[in-house]
């Protein structure tokens, strides 16, 4: 693999050349040219990617690292799992060659096959220690396997061909690895929002895909969010923006970047030509688009002070993910409502789902949302059978904290959460912030009492005053009948049998001795034994029984467990929720349309 200098004949100080030639082996070939290496040049590959808080050990996919100077081999010493030292002549260019296996379809790493290639710089581009702030370049080289492919990336093009292969530049290493690259045969569309050119590429869509609808709806989201952050007429922080969507049979997720986002969704989630009304999957996709785009401001510019400068070698801890992910989660669906893509009923259904997810998580009473933020590295991204019992999602509970703060500020009559977000943007000049900064702006926008409430919501495990605050803004709460799994304290998977995935703390299933991994085979009630294949069968065969026997399979043994549902199998009716009684399943409806409209449409308090 040989790369060429740019048109000026001058190669940037740090130059990467990437080629997708061995597509059937899923291998990217990479060459790193260092114009002025140190005598003992250190190199490392990040262990994590910003925005996804888990040590992922990207170096496990790197192989065959070699170094040369003037065509001659140079000694390479591996110092750790992700670090190498090159014994260089500091007066000559150093060329490092290696391959990276790309076999992860997620948005976090890299993928390569005959159809498409994708990578984040954190998976392919070594960090040249001591030279991170120097200009970097990425050259994408074509190959016989990629001759009809196109390229999409947020990197600045310097010298590229019609398909996008060629030379791109970045001001420094952080910028280089914050601009993922999509390659392949894909659908491409564009629009302008807030004066900023936007591009949308979609790989893997079915022929029925309605690209024009996706573009039109995405444009509405972008225009609404730009208007939100730049109500004062200031310019957005990016010159252009790229959406990269990988469409597969069944997956979902996204990762934010400074002027782009990588997304993944299921084919059935896309809008279809001739379809008058898209399904819930499409609304979920629009929520994802809204979420990642909002991160352009809230995470990529506004960010935790602890992450002002990334340490790519280890975990970067912060207690503020409730703000950066949770508040973004509050606004993602809210902007679908403000942009006219959801009606009030659809939006409240999404809010209801979030509330119930939190209320049905025993871990909310064990760990605060600030603690959950700090523990993201070992808990949120490493979920297991006990996760629901000992932690809470900083996405979902964080979004409810944002909801409560917005409603509390509006009830106070002076401001709202929109003012807080824009105030933080102004006072930080779109840079790092601390919790103290958030509290100070809340105090200024509302009063110190509301700031104190926010601090308590974030650092305690008390339930949030959701019903009281919603009621003050025209939203009535009602207690909804719980599903059987919720009544029993179970989370299950049904596939011709009942597989127990989680046993929730304090529930009837835990008291009976059930555990994650059990297969629930049968129930015995009133002297009759019944085989079950789905959880509803329990209610079918044992309704009205105050005690029943559950037969479960565990480690090839059949166990007999006594379950005391205590009338939980009986059907229940909905009832109004008063603010004093604990509720684990909530429904919402509008009781005062004018008050609700002021909140849902973003009218100032």
Predicted regions and their residues:
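Post-HExxH zinc-binding segment in Zn-dependent metallohydrolases
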Residues: 261-268, 301-302, 313-364, 551
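Early extracytoplasmic/domain-onset interaction patches
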Residues: 2-48
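Soluble non-cytosolic domains of exported or imported proteins
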Residues: 132, 208-220, 279-280, 284, ...
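Juxtacatalytic substrate-recognition/specificity segment
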Residues: 190-321
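N-terminal, post-signal-peptide region of Sec/Tat-exported proteins
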Residues: 37-67
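C-terminal recognition in membrane/secretory proteostasis and scaffolding
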Residues: 332, 342-605
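Non-catalytic architectural context of zinc metalloproteases
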Residues: 4, 56-64, 68, 72-220, ...
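Intrinsic-disorder/low-complexity, polar/charged segments enriched in Ser/Thr/Lys/Arg/Asp/Glu/Gln
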Residues: 13-15, 27-31, 40-42, 93-95, ...
């Amino acid at each position: 693999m040989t790369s060429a200098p740019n048109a000026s004949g001058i190669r940037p100080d740090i130059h990467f050349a990437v080629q997708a030639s061995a597509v059937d082996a899923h291998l990217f070939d990479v060459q790193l040219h260092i114009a002025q290496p140190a005598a003992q040049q250190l190199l490392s590959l990040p262990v994590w990617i910003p925005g996804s808080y888990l040590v992922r050990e990207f170096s496990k996919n790197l192989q065959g690292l070699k170094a040369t100077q003037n065509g001659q081999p140079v000694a390479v010493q591996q110092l750790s799992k992700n670090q190498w030292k090159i014994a260089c002549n500091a007066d000559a260019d150093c060329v490092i060659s290696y391959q990276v296996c790309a076999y992860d379809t997620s948005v976090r790493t890299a993928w390569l096959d005959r159809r498409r290639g994708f990578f984040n710089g954190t998976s392919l581009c070594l960090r040249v220690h001591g030279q991170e702030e120097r200009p970097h370049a990425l050259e994408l080289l074509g190959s016989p396997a990629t001759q009809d492919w196109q390229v999409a990336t947020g990197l600045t093009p310097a010298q590229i061909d019609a398909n996008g292969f060629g030379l791109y530049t970045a001001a420094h290493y952080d910028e280089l690895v914050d601009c993922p690259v999509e390659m392949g045969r894909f659908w491409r569309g564009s629009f302008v929002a807030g004066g900023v050119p936007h591009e949308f590429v979609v790989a893997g869509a079915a022929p029925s895909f309605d690209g024009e609808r996706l573009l039109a709806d995405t444009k509405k989201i972008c225009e609404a969010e730009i208007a939100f952050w730049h109500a004062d007429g200031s310019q957005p922080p990016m010159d252009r923006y790229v959406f990269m969507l990988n469409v597969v049979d069944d997956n979902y997720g996204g990762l934010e970047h400074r002027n782009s986002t990588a997304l993944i969704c299921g084919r059935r989630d896309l809008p279809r030509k001739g379809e008058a009304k898209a399904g819930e999957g499409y609304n979920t996709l629009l929520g994802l688009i809204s979420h990642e785009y909002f991160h352009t401001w809230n995470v990529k510019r506004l960010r935790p002070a602890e992450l002002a400068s990334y340490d790519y070698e280890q975990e970067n801890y912060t207690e503020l993910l409730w703000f950066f992910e949770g508040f973004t989660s509050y606004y993602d669906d809210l902007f679908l409502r403000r942009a006219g893509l959801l009606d009030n009923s659809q939006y409240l259904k999404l809010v209801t789902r979030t509330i119930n997810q939190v209320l049905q998580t025993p871990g909310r009473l064990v760990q605060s949302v600030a603690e959950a933020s700090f523990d993201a590295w070992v808990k949120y991204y490493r979920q297991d059978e006990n996760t629901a019992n000992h932690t809470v999602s900083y996405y979902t509970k964080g979004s409810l904290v944002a909801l409560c703060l917005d409603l509390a500020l509006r009830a106070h009559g002076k401001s709202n959460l929109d003012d807080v977000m824009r105030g933080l943007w102004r006072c930080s000049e779109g840079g790092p912030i601390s919790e103290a900064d958030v509290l100070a702006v809340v105090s200024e926008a509302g009063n110190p009492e509301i700031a104190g409430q926010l601090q308590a919501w974030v650092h305690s495990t008390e339930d949030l005053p959701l019903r009281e605050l919603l009621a003050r803004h025209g939203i009535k709460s009602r207690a909804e009948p719980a599903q059987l799994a919720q009544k029993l304290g179970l989370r299950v998977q049904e596939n011709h049998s009942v597989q127990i995935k989680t046993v929730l703390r304090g529930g009837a299933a835990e008291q009976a001795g059930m555990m994650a991994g059990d297969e629930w085979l049968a129930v015995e009630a009133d002297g009759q034994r019944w085989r079950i294949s789905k959880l509803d069968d329990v209610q079918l065969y044992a309704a009205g029984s105050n005690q029943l026997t559950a037969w479960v399979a565990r480690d090839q043994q059949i166990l007999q467990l006594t379950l005391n549902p205590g009338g939980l199998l009986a059907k229940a009716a909905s009832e109004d929720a008063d603010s004093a009684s604990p509720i684990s399943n909530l429904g919402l409806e509008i009781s005062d349309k004018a008050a609700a409209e002021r909140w849902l449409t973003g009218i100032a308090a």
